[in-house]
């Protein structure tokens, strides 16, 4: 053989190696690899042009997306770099800190992202997980549909045959013919499960959640849980029950709302199974074994109950650590920020009945639909963008709706549960009363009952129940296609078979065409280099981000903390505790709260000369307390006049100077404060005194007054906090002037160490508490005054001294 021939042979063998390896894989693995590849390509297409900007842009619109990037990055920064608790930290809202509630929403996804961030970086990792959520959602729905179709009986008529003895050879031929025909009839459809995956994974509602709500977009465990739930209750399998319980518990680490939806879904499926068990009996079985009989029915019920109990126990065990963190947070914050919203709030965030069948405002295929409904797919008023918001993309698609209707009519026995699920969750999504064409008909709906169920009533937006509607419609679509394929095979003599099959082949593409919102919105993300520079600066200090009083801007700027790893003050979280919100939102703390609130335009007006003078006087005290070292201003997020005013303020008041100016991010270095004495003087009646007061204080305007002699500040709640900075850990004495309306016992804690107890009377006087050195720490310290019960306007305080 010549050299060229040898080279050609080696090259051909090398080129064919991937194909050979693929063909050597087991058939089942090859099948699922092909399915996953197809879904991946479709996910890239339906999110176009994200693939062209994979490392420099995020899918979605201005709003929450940046905060979810922070959640992923913060998990890595907290666990790997800082080695602090990512769920409870004072690296945000410093020094009060608190629960990083946003991280609860995607904690599982954030944990998975850690190794990917080392490989691809933060932005690309977010996009990888974004696409993976769609691919696995589609694949899981495909598996669920396959399970339902493969375990379903063939819907046909029973014929009567006169059986006469046949010779052995004829008997064998007849047996082979019957089994072959039965196999063809019961062969699971390949197209139907694939379409089911498309209907759920690429539904406009789910793609809408991808614009802002990364937690609700991560639906990949929903169909997998439904799959193992059905298997567990059908087969009474412990293994499937444990798997279902794990999946249900893990859903809570993605989003509590999804977990609640699945609990309701489980209740509906269990009720459906119980009713079916009660009314169905198998005539071919002995009476004692029939599901409807006394003996068989009891055994079946006991097995179903034990399976459901196992699912519940396993899921509780999985979610227990997260519930423990919730309980700890509720103890600190009171928990009232996770509250039940008024029914009127939910009514404004409910679907119109026509929302499901009217193309949404982001539709590519139906941009000029003549049917426009205010608040559904059209603005309710000039400038209103609510119709383009994530929750408003409820359109289920005409083809999916037609397939669901067909399955309900032609395959009622197999379709009825999914019809009930779609109907019930659709009714939940309509909210407390029925709306048609934007008009409230005042017809009460089942959501009113949900609003009375504890925990479930914390889901304040009824629209979000629509995600289960799409899952049910996906299964109904699969049942319809499965039935249509059978009927096409039977009636191939009337219409050419290839024409009908081609029509079915077009279905997935037509469905995707109805669902498409192309080009899919993306937002470019440029992480300023200065944040990488700040990450390399040694030490534990605070970076002042500007602006943050607008929640959208806070969601964006907090994303950068995952890069620099330093403390920040204001941040965005999906639920902010009242005490934290009051401290960083409405107090008169110089510079970082009152002044920036005005300079950023969050409060109308201008800083007065007296306020600027007060800021200059308090400058060192504020810088020292928060340990402010750098400020980063984003002029593109501010009005030109605001950016100019903030630049002048930072230079004049904080004596800051620019160290980096890249246009969209201007970084300032803030000179350190002069050394202070060991004595800390806190007058709660002064604006600067509010800086030291954490949770549990009632700052009023005008202030409370004692008999016209002096002002004072009330405590509020079951405990109050005081923060102070110590240069070194040495014993100190805390003295505070206070009185109580009635005798009150107060327990004093220093950094979670109990250091004393005092009793307050109705006489104003100084109380002394020793702060031992072993409980103190260099840097920030927290004193907690614990009252044993929630108080309001019972204890008054004027000044606090620590020396």
Stretches with model-predicted labels:
Residues 285, 289-308, 403-445, 492-493, ...:
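Membrane-interface helix-loop-helix junctions at transmembrane boundaries of multi-pass membrane enzymes
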Residues 42-137, 203-219, 345-387, 433-454:
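Membrane-interface coil-to-helix junctions
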Residues 233, 262-314, 411, 487:
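Perimembrane helix-loop-helix junctions
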Residues 341-344, 367, 374, 507-688:
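Extracytoplasmic
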Residues 674-731, 737-742, 788-803:
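Glycan-recognition and processing domains
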Residues 161-162, 169, 188-191, 234-249, ...:
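Short hydrophobic alpha-helices at membrane interfaces in multi-pass membrane enzymes
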Residues 39-45, 129-148, 190-276, 311-315, ...:
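Membrane-embedded helix bundles of polyisoprenyl
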Residues 142-153, 158-180, 187-202, 498-508:
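Transmembrane-helix signature of polytopic, membrane-embedded enzymes
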């Amino acid at each position: 053989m010549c050299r060229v021939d040898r080279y050609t042979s080696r090259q051909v063998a090398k080129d064919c190696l991937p194909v050979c390896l693929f063909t050597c894989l087991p058939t089942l693995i090859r099948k699922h690899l092909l399915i996953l590849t197809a879904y991946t390509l479709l996910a890239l297409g339906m999110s176009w042009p994200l693939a062209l900007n994979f490392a420099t842009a995020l899918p979605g619109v201005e709003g929450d997306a940046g905060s979810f990037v922070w959640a992923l990055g913060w998990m890595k920064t907290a666990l790997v770099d800082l080695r602090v608790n990512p769920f409870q930290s004072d690296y945000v809202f410093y020094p009060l800190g608190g629960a990083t509630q946003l991280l609860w929403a995607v904690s599982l996804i954030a944990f998975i992202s850690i190794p990917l961030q080392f490989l691809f970086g933060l932005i690309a990792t977010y996009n990888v997980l974004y696409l993976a959520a769609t691919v696995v959602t589609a694949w899981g729905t495909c598996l669920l549909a396959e399970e339902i179709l493969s375990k379903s009986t063939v819907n046909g008529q029973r014929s009567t045959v006169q059986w006469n003895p046949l010779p052995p050879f004829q008997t064998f031929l007849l047996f082979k013919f019957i089994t072959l025909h039965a196999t063809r009839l019961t062969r699971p459809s390949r197209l139907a499960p694939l379409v089911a995956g498309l209907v759920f994974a690429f539904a406009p509602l789910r793609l809408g959640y991808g614009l802002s709500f990364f937690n609700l977009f991560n639906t990949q465990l929903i169909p997998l849980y439904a799959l193992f739930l059905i298997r567990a209750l059908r087969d009474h399998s412990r293994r499937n029950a444990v798997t279902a319980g794990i999946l249900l518990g893990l859903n809570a680490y993605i989003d509590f709302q999804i977990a609640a939806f699945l609990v309701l879904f489980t209740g509906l499926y269990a009720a459906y199974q119980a009713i079916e068990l009660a009314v169905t009996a198998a005539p071919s079985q002995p009476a004692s074994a029939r599901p409807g009989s006394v003996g068989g029915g009891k055994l079946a019920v006991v097995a179903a109950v034990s399976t459901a109990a196992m699912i519940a126990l396993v899921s509780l065990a999985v979610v227990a650590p997260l519930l423990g963190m919730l309980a700890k947070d509720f103890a600190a914050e009171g928990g009232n920020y996770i509250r039940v919203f008024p029914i009127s709030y939910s009514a404004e965030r409910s679907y119109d009945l026509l929302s499901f069948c009217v193309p949404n405002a982001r539709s590519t295929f139906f941009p000029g639909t003549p049917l426009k409904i205010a608040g559904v797919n059209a603005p309710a008023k000039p400038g209103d963008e609510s119709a383009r918001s994530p929750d408003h993309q409820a359109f289920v698609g005409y083809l999916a709706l037609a397939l669901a209707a067909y399955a309900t009519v032609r395959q009622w026995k197999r379709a009825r549960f999914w019809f009930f699920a779609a109907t019930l969750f659709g009714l939940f999504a309509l909210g407390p009363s029925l709306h048609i064409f934007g008009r409230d008909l005042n017809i009460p709906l089942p959501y009113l009952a949900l609003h009375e169920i504890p925990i479930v009533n914390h889901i304040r937006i009824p629209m979000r129940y629509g995600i289960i509607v799409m899952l049910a419609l996906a299964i109904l679509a699969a049942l319809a296609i499965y039935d249509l394929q059978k009927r096409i095979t039977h009636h191939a003599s009337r219409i050419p078979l290839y024409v009908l099959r081609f029509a079915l082949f077009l279905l997935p593409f037509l469905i995707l065409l109805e669902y498409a919102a192309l080009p899919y919105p993306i937002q470019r993300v440029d992480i300023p280099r200065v944040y990488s520079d700040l990450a390399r600066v040694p030490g534990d200090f605070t970076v002042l981000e500007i602006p943050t009083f607008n929640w959208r801007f806070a969601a964006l700027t907090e994303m950068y903390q995952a890069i620099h790893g330093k403390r920040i003050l204001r941040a965005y979280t999906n639920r902010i505790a009242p005490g934290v919100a009051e401290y960083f939102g409405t107090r008169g703390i110089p510079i970082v709260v009152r002044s920036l609130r005005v300079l950023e335009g969050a409060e109308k007006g201008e800083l007065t000369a007296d306020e600027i003078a007060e800021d200059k006087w308090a400058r060192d005290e504020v810088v020292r307390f928060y340990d402010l070292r750098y400020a980063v201003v984003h002029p593109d997020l501010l009005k030109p006049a605001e950016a100019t005013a903030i630049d002048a303020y930072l230079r004049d008041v904080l004596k800051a100077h620019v160290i980096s100016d890249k246009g969209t991010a201007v970084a300032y270095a803030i000179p350190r404060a002069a050394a202070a004495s060991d004595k800390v003087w806190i007058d709660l009646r002064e604006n600067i005194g509010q800086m030291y007061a954490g949770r549990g204080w009632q700052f009023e305007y005008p202030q409370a007054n004692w008999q016209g002699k002096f002002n004072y500040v009330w405590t509020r709640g079951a405990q109050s906090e005081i923060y102070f900075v110590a240069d070194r850990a040495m014993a100190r004495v805390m003295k505070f002037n206070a009185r109580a309306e009635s005798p009150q016992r107060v327990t004093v804690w220093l950094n979670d160490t109990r250091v004393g107890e005092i009793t307050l009377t109705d006489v104003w006087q100084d109380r002394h508490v020793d702060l031992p050195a072993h409980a103190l720490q260099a840097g920030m310290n927290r004193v907690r005054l614990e009252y044993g019960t929630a108080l309001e306007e019972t204890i008054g305080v004027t000044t606090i001294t620590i020396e």
